Amino acid sequence: LDLVKQYFGGEMLGALGNHEFSRYMWLEPSENTEAYKARSADVLAKVFPFDLRLHARVVNGVNFVTLDSVYGYVCPDQVERFRAEAKKGLPIVLCTHVPFYTDGIWRASQKFWSRAGKRFESAAIPDARGDYKIQQTDPTTRDFIAYLKKEPLLKGLLAGHLHITVRERFSPTAMQFVVGGNFLSHGQEVTFA
């Protein structure tokens, strides 16, 4: 947090991840709930210069919207706020920590994290679990993803979390780019035209 204070200015825009909300990383169990997140939210909100739940900034006529999806789901208040952003009528790039999974992104993630011999065993989509299962079973999140797939103003999604770099068509109007961590020297320049 000291580095955020020192190096990130007021113009920063971002979507925090599970590492920011985890107070002790692997030294205590993470509950993946809003209550668990709330334990760290006040401290984080004082350091990061943007609304942690949902923040929007227009840059060169494009509405960059960051959305807290740290545990794979979204909440009703975030859906309402996103819809209000869409009513502005500007092209939208949605930035999240956890991607909104497609079958292809889920498959790529599971193959990456599989034991080496299992990686090339099958082209089948692995059974949903974790964040992917939450996105399929949580009604608010599932409905929001269905809405996003039909939102013509959505032009791109930028995400991380998986520690792999992959991209896939999310909807007729939007590509989703998932980029691995900087600690792996991953990065991707995305140009929107």
Give the ranges of each region predicted by the language model.
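Short, catalytically relevant binding-site loops at active-site mouths
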Residues: 71-73, 99-103, 164
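Extended active-site neighborhood of metal-dependent phosphoesterases/phosphodiesterases
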Residues: 1-91, 115-121, 150-153, 167-192
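Active-site glycine-centered loops adjacent to acidic/histidine catalytic or metal-binding residues
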Residues: 17-18, 97, 160-161
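Active-site-proximal segments of metal-dependent phosphoesterases and phosphodiesterases across multiple
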Residues: 91-153
